[in-house]
Curated annotation (Swiss-Prot):
PANTHER family named among the record's database cross-references: CDK5 REGULATORY SUBUNIT-ASSOCIATED PROTEIN 1 (PTHR43020), MITOCHONDRIAL TRNA METHYLTHIOTRANSFERASE CDK5RAP1 (PTHR43020:SF2)
An annotated Gene Ontology molecular function: N6-isopentenyladenosine methylthiotransferase activity
Cofactor note text: Binds 2 [4Fe-4S] clusters. One cluster is coordinated with 3 cysteines and an exchangeable S-adenosyl-L-methionine.
Quaternary state and interactors: Monomer.
Amino-acid positions noted as binding [4Fe-4S] cluster 2 in the UniProt annotation, renumbered to this chain: 156, 160, 163
Record keywords, A-Z: 4Fe-4S, Cytoplasm, Iron, Iron-sulfur, Metal-binding, S-adenosyl-L-methionine, Transferase, tRNA processing
MTTase N-terminal domain residues: 3-119
Organism (species): Saccharopolyspora erythraea (strain ATCC 11635 / DSM 40517 / JCM 4748 / NBRC 13426 / NCIMB 8594 / NRRL 2338)
Function: Catalyzes the methylthiolation of N6-(dimethylallyl)adenosine (i(6)A), leading to the formation of 2-methylthio-N6-(dimethylallyl)adenosine (ms(2)i(6)A) at position 37 in tRNAs that read codons beginning with uridine.
Subcellular location, principal: cytoplasm
TRAM domain mapped to chain residues: 375-446
Protein name, per record: tRNA-2-methylthio-N(6)-dimethylallyladenosine synthase
The EC number(s) this enzyme carries: 2.8.4.3
CDD domains linked: Radical_SAM
């Protein structure tokens, strides 16, 4: 009898993409995706360990599943991802109804571990300390018909004092340029219009094979792939953000003028305590160069409020950088103490009420800036890649949603001849009529509508399914010279 599965994903884009790999492996092993109205035979939690409430969220959700497990002993529950890598066997101690625990380094073991647990009728816990196989070797069931994630590396060599990710995902491992471009080409061949290049520190790409200009070259090579309309990347580190990457962004037509670059703090003293290896002026200088090369660039960031020892003066320095940077938007976080990180042991842990008050002030400032920046775009014509389910009120307002080339979310009204014809994955042109802090609105006429293969696939329920690229871990040393190829690999 065919068994069904459901994957619940928490955390960053890396986890979202890892879940696509998990789905691809399960389907290759004969599982089918569970419908929304049935209990799955296998539930997989792909977890995050970055925020303090990650533990509570996981164990709360596991508790909610226990009655279903009691009713159906054949149901299996698996826990993977960063929290599994951290907590290991503690998970089955706290939730003994869990069947499988696997980490960030052995995604490919999941089908085997499920079968072993079912056969042995006991929990299987397998956590590796380094990569078993590179994730790109695993098949993937893609979630989107029009947009795809492509990892350029896994792991991180930075030692930020607040971050537990390097301890859980390991040192940086880079894929070879040809492997990356082959995966991008495979996605485009399936109708995908947009790819996002992923890495914990994406612009450090090339460190493993000694080419500090490798990421800029990779962007330019993506520009040679016919049919690839949009290229994005996340997340870069200011320390490694070089002028050649700015030039590649500005000079490669399909690379989007969008930059998400974490600031974390505007205080040089706090940045030093965070081990961020840049200072606020260096950060602002990068933004200046980006805007000189691409005046239309949308720049977003991450900011942590309430890092241990942060003074009112430190916080005001962050507010000043935010005023100068004029971010299109910012992901703001209250500092979360994570056991196992140096920051967790630092003196000067701030009272919750102080952190909350500063957080509220930062949110108020950034919302106003986002709104002001958005209002400058009213009257501008934009090209939108129509997206699925990004507008919470789309059903009520009869609007659809899409992403502009700079990544901004735009809600638009498909009236007239295109009413009922526009699908996720299609491309439309319209004009911005109104701005809000977190989105733009285009209630004007649709001036152009292009139906795409991606839209056809969305309508048919077809999603790309890519096989693994290459075998084993990437080799060390410089990559071999790439022959002239259709995808224009010049790395």
């Amino acid at each position: 009898m065919t068994r069904s599965y459901q994957i619940r994903t928490y955390g960053c884009q890396m986890n979202v993409h890892d879940s696509e790999r998990l789905a691809g492996m399960l389907e290759d092993a004969g599982y089918v995706r569970a419908g929304t109205d049935v209990d799955p035979d296998v539930v997989v939690f792909n977890t995050c360990a970055v925020r303090e409430n990650a533990d509570n969220r996981l164990y709360g959700n596991l508790g909610h599943l226990r009655p279903a497990k009691d009713r159906n002993p054949g149901m299996q529950i698996a826990v993977g991802g960063c929290l599994a890598q951290k907590d290991r066997g503690e998970i089955v101690k706290r939730a003994p109804w869990v069947d499988v625990v696997f980490g960030t380094h052995n995604l490919g073991s999941l089908p085997t571990l499920l079968e072993r647990a079912r056969h042995n009728e006991e929990a299987e816990v397998e956590i590796l300390e380094s990569l078993d196989v590179f994730p790109s070797t695993l098949p993937a069931r893609r979630e989107s018909a029009y947009s795809g994630w492509v990892s350029v590396s896994v792991g991180c060599n930075n030692t930020c004092t607040f971050c537990i990710v390097p301890a859980l995902r390991g040192k940086e491992k880079d894929r070879r340029p040809g492997e990356i471009l082959s995966e991008v080409q495979a996605l485009v061949s399936e109708g995908v219009l947009e790819v996002t290049l992923l890495g914990q520190n994406v612009n450090a790409y090339g460190v493993e094979f000694g080419d500090r200009f490798a990421f800029g070259k990779l962007l330019r090579s993506c520009g040679e792939i016919e049919g690839l309309e949009r290229v994005r990347f996340t997340s870069p580190h200011p320390r490694d953000f070089t002028d050649d990457v700015i030039a590649a962004m500005a000079e490669t037509p399909n690379v989007c003028h969008q930059l998400h670059m974490p600031l974390q703090s505007g205080s040089d003293r706090v940045l030093k305590q965070m081990r961020r290896s840049y200072r606020s002026q260096r950060y602002l200088d990068i933004l200046r160069k980006v805007r000189e090369a691409m005046p239309d660039a949308a720049i977003t960031t991450d900011i942590i409020v309430g890092f241990p020892g942060e003074t009112e003066e430190d916080f005001e320095a962050t507010m000043q950088v935010v005023r100068e940077a004029r971010f299109a938007s910012a992901f703001t976080f209250q500092y979360s103490k994570r056991p196992g990180t140096p920051a967790a042991e630092m003196e000067g842990q701030l009272p919750k009420e102080v952190v909350q008050q500063r957080y509220d002030r930062l949110i108020e400032l950034q919302n106003q800036i986002s709104w002001d920046v958005g209002k400058e775009l009213v009257g501008r014509s934009v090209e939108l890649l129509v997206a699925e389910g990004e507008g919470r009120k789309d059903t009520e307002t009869h609007r659809l949603s899409g992403r502009a080339r700079d990544g901004r979310l735009v809600h638009f009204t498909p009236v007239g001849a295109v009413d009922g014809q526009v699908r996720p994955g299609d491309v439309v042109h319209t004009t911005i009529t109104r701005a809000a802090p977190h989105h733009l609105v285009a209630d004007s006429e649709i001036t152009a509508h292009r139906r795409t293969r991606a839209g056809d696939h969305w309508e048919e329920g077809v999603r790309p399914k890519t096989s693994g690229v290459s075998l084993g871990l990437p080799s060390f040393g410089a990559p071999p010279a790439q022959p002239a190829a259709q995808q224009g690999c010049a790395c």
